[in-house]
Amino acid sequence: MTLQCTKSAGHWRMVVWDEEGFQGRRHEFTAECPSVLELGFETVRSLKVLSGAWVGFEHAGFQGQQYVLERGDYPGWDAWGGNTAYPAERLTSFRPVACANHRDSRLTIFEQENFLGRKGELNDDYPSLQAMGWDGTEVGSFHVQSGAWVCSQFPGYRGFQYILESDHHSGDYKHFREWGSHAHTFQVQSVRRIQQ
């Protein structure tokens, strides 16, 4: 069973700039933005998350690589993409993560797509799934019972990031194509809970 989350109005707040180092034009968000182009920005190159957790996307329409953005300062692309294999130097769309709940997050991982094969129940951060006993470097599918998670391609939270939430797809991610428009493989080797 997937637990539904409650979205509280005004819980998310983020300020973005079109130049690195918090310089240039500035805009504040309290809700999703499918394209900064509509605001007259070409891109976002620095940002500060003041409250809530967000997902930043490389392209408009919530497409391309995705990056979890938790409370803090991101003076340049290396602050949000420094651990990824192919960092995006800009972000052009954003949305809040409604179900982030670090204390009450539960995730089931499956060996094969469509929730088949061996499974593992997670409720903590795992910098290496292999170290916790998971065989191989791939996860076929996920079921998010509660909370929100960021899954990474390589151990130590490196490589491509995939954001999984209990309030998207009813918490069911049957195939890597549902992890994001940039997902091209079942390779996932580390997972962690997203913090508000």
UniProtKB/Swiss-Prot annotation:
What keywords are annotated for this sequence in UniProt?
Acetylation, Eye lens protein, Repeat
Q: Which GO terms describe its molecular function?
A: identical protein binding; structural constituent of eye lens
Q: Where is this region: N-terminal arm?
A: 2-11
Q: Which cysteines are joined by disulfide bonds?
A: none
The residue ranges of the Beta/gamma crystallin 'Greek key' domain are: 12-51, 52-98, 105-146, 147-195
For the modification N-acetylthreonine, the affected residues are T2
Give the domain of life: Eukaryota
Biological process (GO), any one = camera-type eye development
Q: Where is this region: Connecting peptide?
A: 99-104
Query: What is annotated about its quaternary structure and interactions?
Result: Homo/heterodimer, or complexes of higher-order. The structure of beta-crystallin oligomers seems to be stabilized through interactions between the N-terminal arms.
Q: What is known of its domains?
A: Has a two-domain beta-structure, folded into four very similar Greek key motifs.
Q: What family does the entry list? A: Belongs to the beta/gamma-crystallin family.
What the protein does comes down to: Crystallins are the dominant structural components of the vertebrate eye lens.
Protein name, please?
Beta-crystallin A4
